[in-house]
Amino acid sequence: MKFAPCLALQVAAAAVALTSAAFAAEGLKLVRLANPVGGHIHPAACVSAKGTLVVTYGHVNHRDLRLTRSTDGGATWSEPKPFAPTVGKTYYPGSLTTLRDGRLLHAWNRWSEPTNEKEPRSVLYSLSSDDGLTWSEPKPFPRDEKIVSNIRHPIVELTSNQWLLSLSDKTQVFDPTTGASQPFGDGRAHGLVPIVRTPKGSFISGTGLRSTDVGKTWQAIAPFPNLKEQGWRHEMVCLANGWLIASEILGPGVGGERIRYVLSRDDGVTWGEVFEYYNPGRAIGGRACPRTVELGGGNIGVVFYDVEPKQAGGPGLFFLKLSVDRLGREAKIRSSN
C-alpha cells in the first residue's frame, strides 16, 4: 500500500531569509521552512541520491508529523504536509536515512497503541523510492513489548541487509529481509546516541567511544562532546572527506544561547575545534535538535528549530547552508565557552 501526500508548489515566499545579524556566522542565510505549533518538534533530515532534501518534524506535539522537501539545495521548500503513515495516529519523532540503493528510510516512534501517548514506545519504519513523495506500509523493528525502545538518529547501512540501529534500549544489527536482529560488536547498548562509520571503517559512538574492529572493542575518546546526556537532542555526522562534526549547545536554560559544531579531522580521535553557526543574541526557544546533512558541491545544511515567539515570524523551523571549506577554514580552537 502506498501513501501519497498532496504535492505542493515550492514558493520562495514561504522560505523567509533572515539577515546575518541574527546569528554569529557572517554571510549565512537562515531560511524558514516551517512554522511548528510546538511540543516535540525534533526534525529529521536526509538528502536523496537526486539531491532532494527531505525533512520531517513535529508540527503539533505527538499528533501531526509533517514532511517538507526542497529540490534547490534548501533555498525554497514545499508546503509541509502530514506524513501519511501517521495521519490519525500518535507518534514521537524519529530519523531519516538515505540508503545506498537510493531509497529513503524514515523510522519513527509509536506509542503503546495507535492513538494514545502511553509507554512503552517502539519503532516503525517506512521506505520511499520517489524522494519522499510516497511511502511504503510501515513495518516494526524487533521489540520487547515491555520495554521502551526509541530511535532519533540515522541508521548505519553496513550492507544492504544489515542496518545498524542505535536504539534507546539496545544497539542492534537488523536484517530487513528477514526481520531478525542481533547485537552489534561486543553486544553493549550504547543508548539513544548517534553512531557513525568513517571512510576508514572506524565506528564513533556518541557515548565517547571509538572502535576500529567493527565494534568488537572500544576505546574512550577524551575530551569528547557531551552527546550522551541528551542523546535524543544532539547529533554527530561523518562527512565524505572524513571529518566528523557533533553538535554543542551552550548557555543556560532549556535551549541555551548558541549552537556550534565540534570538529574532528583525524577519524574521531581528537575533537579540538569548533564553529559557531547560530547565536540569536538571546535564549533559544526550545531544544533546537539540529540535524545536519551533506548537500554535495562542497556544502552541508543544518535544520533546527527556535520557538521564541517574539522573533520575526514567530516560532520557526530553520535551514542553514554552509560550505565545508568555510567550516574547516574558520573553525577555532575549542574552549569551554
Predicted features and spans:
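Bacterial N-terminal signal peptides that target proteins for export
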Residues: 1-12
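Sec/Tat signal peptide C-region and signal peptidase I cleavage site
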Residues: 20-24
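Asp-box/BNR beta-propeller blade signature and adjacent active/binding-site loops
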Residues: 25-337
